[in-house]
Design a protein with these regions (language model features):
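Short, Lys/Arg-enriched N-terminal segments with co-localized hydrophobic residues
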Residues: 1, 13-33
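Nudix hydrolase/Nudix homology domain
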Residues: 27-183, 194, 238-242, 284, ...
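Cys/His-rich short segments
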Residues: 172-222
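N-terminal strand-loop-strand
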Residues: 201-244, 270-271, 294-296
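The catalytic Nudix box helix
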Residues: 243-278, 292
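Active-site-adjacent beta-strand/loop module that shapes the phosphate/pyrophosphate-binding cleft
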Residues: 280-302
């Protein structure tokens, strides 16, 4: 049998979402929460055309790296810290796609976040040179806009170096950057795509094709047996810490079917009593993650898929303490199992 909600579903729904004039923000009552749990700050993701201001934030990506300020701590760039040339170019159509140099992404409270429309490593390096030149000019004129030491950092490294709010903002901006970067031309006719003026969508003026942001559904599974949880480690990824069974939902497949298939493929186990826990936006990989717990049906003997995993082992509940990073759904599910044991399956 499949239970869609836990017995605390009423509390879950009450605590998950609040909507106001088309915006939403995630509210979590109690607990440290995950990357998106930034209340009382409000996240507004509705698509709008907005004018940038000095206090707003601008992101410059190059592949999987983000340009940051790095002095005593890592921080992001304000609009006022970027070159005057950039600000001027926001007032006109500056590239062959009819796009302005700055693309509005979203806001958190009253701060707006923008993407600098740069798609290649060479373009990104030129922008950095511009900012260095601008910094020298400011210092010579004794203007108090020193942008500090610029550095490229991988987007995933921000999980351990910035606040939860900043990590969420950067991951969500990266999600949109990847989508804009990868959808400059129409996949149907090959013509240039133009950003729509009313919604977040790229439109082809030639054939009418409409391209929306990519969101890939995936599951995280806490497999439980005899008050133990199945912990894994990936075989071919940079991330080397403990994880849970995870995988993408395939065409024509429900999330619950994904749970059964992924567990069988990766560790050779059958599961039952599948219980939904929570979901999480995960901009690092353009995912919407859905968390489930499931009980082993039959034997607990593991058959490891070595192409996917380097390790899979049963870990007793008392040994799962202290694994919550207050960022990821996976880590919160580990902490939830430590706190509640097999009650997670109720």
């Amino acid at each position: 049998g499949v239970r869609i909600f836990s017995r605390t579903w009423k509390k879950d729904f009450e605590s998950l979402f609040s909507r106001d004039l088309g915006s939403f923000y995630y509210i979590k009552k109690g607990g440290a929460g995950m990357i998106q749990d930034i209340a009382p700050m409000k996240f507004h993701n509705e698509y709008q055309q907005r004018e940038c201001r000095d206090k707003d934030i601008v992101f410059l990506f190059s592949g999987n790296k983000l340009l940051v300020k790095k002095d005593s701590k890592i921080s992001f760039f304000y609009i006022k810290e970027f070159s005057k040339e950039l600000i001027k170019e926001t007032e006109q159509e500056a590239d062959g796609f009819g796009n302005k140099r700055l693309q509005y992404l979203f806001s958190i409270d009253d701060v707006q976040y923008y993407l600098l429309n740069v798609w290649t490593k060479e373009e990104a390096e030129k922008e950095v040179e511009k900012q260095l030149d601008e910094q020298v000019n400011r210092q010579s004129k004794k203007q108090n806009h020193n942008i500090g030491n610029m550095e490229w950092v991988t987007i995933r490294s921000l999980r351990e170096t910035v606040s939860k709010k900043d990590c969420f903002a950067a991951a969500t901006a990266y999600h949109l950057y990847v989508w804009y970067r990868d959808n400059r031309y129409c996949g149907r006719c090959g013509k240039e795509l133009q950003p729509d003026t009313k919604e977040r969508m790229m439109r082809c003026a030639c054939c009418g094709n409409m391209v929306y942001p990519k969101i890939a559904p995936a599951v995280i599974v806490g497999v439980i047996y005899d008050n133990k949880i199945l912990m894994t480690k990936y075989s071919d990824r940079e991330y080397k810490k403990y994880a849970l069974i995870a995988g993408f939902t395939e065409i024509g497949e429900t999330a619950e079917e994904t749970v059964r298939r992924e567990v069988m493929e990766e560790v050779g186990l059958k599961v039952k009593d599948i219980v939904y826990y929570k979901s999480q936006p995960w901009g690092f990989d353009s995912n919407l993650l859905m968390g489930f717990y499931a009980r082993v049906e039959g034997t607990d003997a593991i058959t490891l898929d070595k192409n996917e995993l380097s390790l899979a082992e049963w870990v007793p509940r008392e040994q799962v303490a202290g694994m919550n990073d207050k960022i990821s759904l996976t880590r919160e599910m580990m902490e939830n199992f430590y706190q509640n044991g097999e009650k997670c399956l109720q």
